Every structure is written in structure tokens, then in C-alpha cells.
Amino acid sequence: MNKLVVELKNTTPLLVGWYTPRRADIRGLRTTEIKGIWRWWARAFIGGALYDEGLLNGVGTNDVLLRPSKKEVECIAKLVGIELGLGLAIARESQASRFTIYVEPLDSITPKDMRDRWRRISLLTIKKSVEGFDASHRFRLNVEWSRDFRYRLTALKILLIALQFTGVGKGSRRGLGSLDVVSISPSLEERDLRSLVREAYDECSELVRRHTKTYGARSSGNKAVELPPLPVVSKRTTSEVPVAEMKVFRDVHRGRFEDVHNFFVRTERCRVLYYSPICHDELRKEKAAWFLGLPRFQKERTQRETGYKAEVERRASPIMLAFHTDKNKFGSGAFVTCFLSGDWPKKIEWHGDHTEKPEKLNINAEAVVNAYKVFSNEFLRYLRGLNVGHQVDAIWP
């Protein structure tokens, strides 16, 4: 039996849920959470390789700008499940994962009521009691496989990348549940994070070229698709903006990360940018805050609807945030990822306060790119307002 052992330490509050969402699994860290982010990033890397080869173009629907076609979904699933070994659940072709993973807590862990710990948690839980774990708990992640196969190291590299750029549990895209990689045994060859991402991408590109015909990937003959139909790790740009971007703001330390995390709470964003909890920031002025994720639709006490509304009930944020300390194998700071893709509703309805009329927004590739630019500019201004963000490592592209 081959084995990789990774020691992890959570750097931010961990809300993993259990058999009921407001309780916390007494083991602290669930294998299903790790498997979930591993598969998500594997799809992103394989999807990026397909997209860059002109093999992932998507199809438009009545409601959504772009979705991957049924054949594209199946192709990605097979490449991830069979070649990367993460398992496949397609009728008549199902295959168990070649990896077995399990997690062991390395210290005593006791769930606590987390509702008042961070501003974001209180918003997620609507001020109701929810169990979680404070930072600094240690876990051992064991990854086992019975026999070697061609792309096993590629899959393991993607796992390490997932642990760098994504947290686990509730609020994971906003930095909750971030996990330092404290040690890796046996140690992979020493490499920095930029090299690790590039190696994983190059190996996925080789995999895609090798198995294009095997799994039915077909070029539409159109390499000028503006956006991929799902978030992918791609080398391409659209309107001179990277389709995928990964950065590390190295000067964000523990005492500042909660402030960075609070960018996604509008009142806190306004406090930093305009010294007031109420403001018309650029995301508000340009009606671009939908880019932070849908739904953004709430009701005031008068029951008047405010925010963004779409026929599609949910669209997760394309922005991911994670935090690591100097104990992390790949360095410390705020790790930020942003993906541009076409899987947005074609129409979003914006509702302001009682003085403003609702407005219908038409979403196309240009609108997605423009919304990203508004977000990016405002986020950098916000970091400057916190006096951080001056030491930046560009990881990808």
C-alpha cells in the first residue's frame, strides 16, 4: 500500500457541519470535505486543459450564458475519475476511486458556538447558534492507493493546490476553514507553489492530448470562445484579462486577515473605503456586486426586496480566499483566486432601496469581464486602505 501523509492545521474558524448543519462533526475535519475540494480542482485543471486545446466550448441555454454540454461533462468526469483516479459514477462505466483517504485529529477538539466569532459567520448563521472549531487544531490527512498509475502524482499535486487555495466547510470561499500544510511525508521534491501549479497544468494538458479521442473530446473548430462554460485553470485571456488568476498577498498576517475577509461584507467594505458603514462603492454604482456570487437577494423589514435576483437560484462566487501562516509549506498570506466563466444567468434583476426603480441587467461575456474589473480595482483599493497588499506573488498565469 502506497501512502502520503499530510499534517494540516486550521488557520481560521472551521464550520464543517454534521448530520444536522448547525452541529459540528466531533472529528473536526471530514473526509467528504477534502474529497469535495480535490474533485473540484481536478475538474478545473482538466477543464482548463480542454478549454486551451479548443475542446471545451459549452452551449447556451434560455437562462444561462454558457453551460458545458452533456458530452463535455462526461469527458471531464472520465478524465478526472479514470485517469486521475478520483472515481467515476456513470452508469455502466462506474469506477471506484483509486485513493482511500481518512483524517485523524491530532489534538483534543471541542465544538464551540461560533455565531459571534467573525462577522461573516454571524451573517451565514443569521445569528443563530452554530457549532465550529477555533483555529490551530491539527489533523493528519492520510491518502492511500494500492498500486501506482500514470497520473497519480498529478492528482496528488492537485490535492495540495486545493488545500492552498480553498478552505473547507461553511464560508470556505471566504477563507473560513483554511488549512496550513505543515508537513508532507514522504516529502515531494522541494518546489514553490508557482511551480506546483504549472506542473499540474502541464501534466493535465498532456493527459488531455493523450486521451482526447478515448473519451470523446471533440473540437468545435472554434478556438475563439470568449469564456469557458465553467471555472477552469486556463492560460487564456479574454479582453486582456486572465480567465484564471491566482495571487498571494504575502504581507497579510493573522491580525489582518479577518479585515481582508470582511471585504465581502458591504458595511465593512464601506468602513474601510469611505469611513462609513453606508456608501455607494464602485460595486454598487456599477451594479456589479452580483459578481461576488448569487443570490444576493434579501428582504428589508418592510419586506421590500433588495439586492440581485435571477431565475437561477444559486451561483457560487468565482472568487476564493484562503489564509495561511508561516507554518505552511508554501508560505503565508492571503491566497486569492478568481475565475472568469460563462455559467451566469443571462438576466439578473437589481433592486435598490425605496427611492430606486428595479433594473434588469443583461449578462454577457463583456459584462462578466467588466464586473471582474470593478471587483479587482475595488479589492486592491480596499487592501491599500488596510495598508496591506504591497507584497504580491503572481502564482498563475
Positions of PLM-derived features:
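Basic, Gly/Ser/Thr-rich N-terminal segments that form RNA-phosphate-binding interfaces in CRISPR RAMP
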Residues: 1-397
